[in-house]
């Protein structure tokens, strides 16, 4: 038999572990590891490759992991975890198979190499299946693993029985994920010796502690030389400076929009996927980021932490307070380039500019009607759904929009002046065109005397409305009454026999 050009050794087919990784394995997993490694060793010997030292066999037989030295531990640690989501990933598999293929090219008549390659693939696949990390659907994964293990445990074509057919399957939930193991190892290797004297929080590096202490002192040592804005930490300044340079390295693959931060890209991508992981526990409404949920919860709690120092009005968001304060200062920094109109908020400018461009980006899926603002679309869609979420607390009537409800509530706020026989005065209520109600008091009137209202209703055409009055035909000097008749289109104005107020409705000049 012709020897291969390159010798295949046991460490080429071994799955290496660090001590911390080995401690995470259950006894059944360690047993399967030992059997797989011994099987690989047997395949090497049967294929004619150089065998390992007896020390290796002794360690495997005692159930200890095959570890070369500290340098190998570091190399294996970085390679095994290269593929996220797999606890045990044998990245040397292709290299080993390539060596086996080279050996087979030199030994075309020898069948042991084919068996060795097949068994190696079989052992690697069996062990790799048990190295999968836990997914969100652990029950489905376990079922899938059991099926794959059963198929992998079928005897090979040469009639040999698989040594793992009767072994208890691995439970993937016993294994940890890459991030958990890395965090565990990092914590053990690096001591957090730098402790904050204010809150007791510990840090690995002194510079991290210094940045943290700035939060307590309020100091912002990292200042932008372009706009003067200061930051607690240097990386915050670096991200801020990208804004001045126009550098947005994170691009959305769906729409091409770019972002300063990766976190901003992650949040934006949820607008494409429709994912809303932050759910309100009160009403069930979902949000794409936690900050929006925090602001929304203030609607339920009534909390308004941002208060205007000028008028005391409260707001749920700081941006709303800043926009409100511009009313007091008179500043309107956002100017429309078309008509020169100034607005206090940037979003207000964007909406206003759509009136010039005719853009209506929010389209109804039912009838195709477009709207400038999303709230307009939401209210419009309630026409199709029949939803009327705003209910009047006075009469129970429901409305599609809050603004319509507010107008309706004004009808309940109109005060009716009831008659009062005890009152020494009479009231005349004048309803103006602009719907403002004016109440005017008149001195008490003697019975059987006409009401002189020419001064009150001069130059106006009026119609007498209200409760019926007792007709009274005046006697004596009727010159004043004649003037009143002319003013009131020949309608007799008399003093009511019971009530002492008269309601006049102004119909025009």
From Swiss-Prot:
Signal peptide: none annotated. It comes from the Eukaryota. Keywords: DNA-binding, Metal-binding, Nucleus, Repeat, Repressor, Transcription, Transcription regulation, Zinc, Zinc-finger. The keyword Transcription regulation applies. CDD domains: KRAB_A-box. PROSITE patterns: KRAB, ZINC_FINGER_C2H2_1, ZINC_FINGER_C2H2_2. A zinc finger (C2H2-type) spans 194-216, 222-244, 250-272, 278-300, 306-328, 334-356, 362-384, 390-412. It is found in: Nucleus matrix; Nucleus. Residues 8-78 form the KRAB domain. The keyword Zinc applies. One of its GO terms (molecular function) is RNA polymerase II cis-regulatory region sequence-specific DNA binding. Its main location: nucleus. Disulfide bonds: none annotated. One of its GO terms (cellular component) is nucleus. PANTHER family: ODD-SKIPPED - RELATED (PTHR14196), ZINC FINGER PROTEIN 208-LIKE (PTHR14196:SF12). Belongs to the krueppel C2H2-type zinc-finger protein family. Transcriptional repressor. Binds to a specific sequence, 5'-GGGxxxCAGxxxTTT-3', within GADD45 intron 3. Interacts with BRCA1. Interacts with RNF11. This is Zinc finger protein 350.
